[in-house]
Amino acid sequence: MTVPVNRREFLERAALSSAALALIHPTIAAAAVPQQPPGMFLSLAPWATARGVGWPDQARLAAKVGFKGIDWAWGPVREAGVDATRALLAELRIHPTIVNMPGPNVLTVDDAAFKASLKQLDEDTAFAAAIGCTRFQRTLGATTPGGRPKDEHWKIVTGRLAAVSDIMVKHKVHVSLEFLGPMVFRMARAGGPGRRGGEPPVPNAPPPPPPAPPVPFVWSLAETLRLCEASGPNIGITLDAWHWHHSEGTVADILSTPRERIVHVHVSDARAMPPADVQDNMRLLPGEGVMDLVGFFQALRTIGWTGGVACETIGARLDNIAPEEQARLGLASTTAVMQRDGVL
């Protein structure tokens, strides 16, 4: 069982890790680390608002347009290496805000695969820290795998996150869990009838078994917070306004969340429509829909939160628009909303 650490122990262990990294990699320690900008700052999410642009052009586009950070992609940056990446980010003055956790999904793989992944996770975390990034992101499934009982899955997830926390705390890195709010994610079923892979139906075959009913897991801010608190001091939340809105989240939910548990923020907007009709690819640019983004950002300001804010407008709204224009639209719309709300 993992022994929880208090804030002082957490900071002491993180400091020792940084000192050890400096001894092992003096060239890394000597180079300038791209520091996190003060307050709330805009970070480019290329998969949403610079589609089709690869690394390192993503970072160059972020700097050209006016972003201060980038939600970066693991594979090409890892291939480029520490020195080249640090030099590029320092040249562009772009902060490496957050990255999706590489490797298998540690929350759903079997026990053997999970245990086998921990050594590589330690190395990957050290790499992220070496380029100045202190945030890994992982999406939470809104239902349990295979219809597993919720209590059983909760125990597995918190136990694994505690093990991940122990590894990442050495490198002063946080895990950011993103819950999925729209109803469609809670209706997902483990398997179902129908053909797969384009295979023709088998004549006279018996009907397939009925799909396992979905078992909802964690899909709201309040419950994600409880999961984080049960898992480790450096386990936090990606607060996505889209998922907050479609989980019927409230401003009070944000005000009840300790600022240190919010690791990253995504923002977009939504049409007014029945919850059962909402699909994840229907997102609008911030300010174009019905979300209470005033309450959202003012609540973040009230709790004293600072960090990266990424426009994540997924779907047709930005189709057929050039990547640079996507980035400019994302930056301009998010900036306008944040300035209107008095947080930027």
Outline where the language-model segments fall.
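Divalent metal-binding pocket/active-site signature
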Residues: 138-146, 154, 168, 186
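C-terminal/domain-terminus segments
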Residues: 319-329
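Acidic/histidine-rich catalytic cores of soluble enzymes
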Residues: 69, 166-290
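Short acidic/histidine-rich active-site segments
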Residues: 308-314
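N-terminal pre-domain/capping segments
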Residues: 2-135, 151-158, 162, 169, ...
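Acidic-and-aromatic substrate-binding clefts and catalytic sites of carbohydrate-active enzymes
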Residues: 49-54, 72-83, 105-109, 144-148, ...
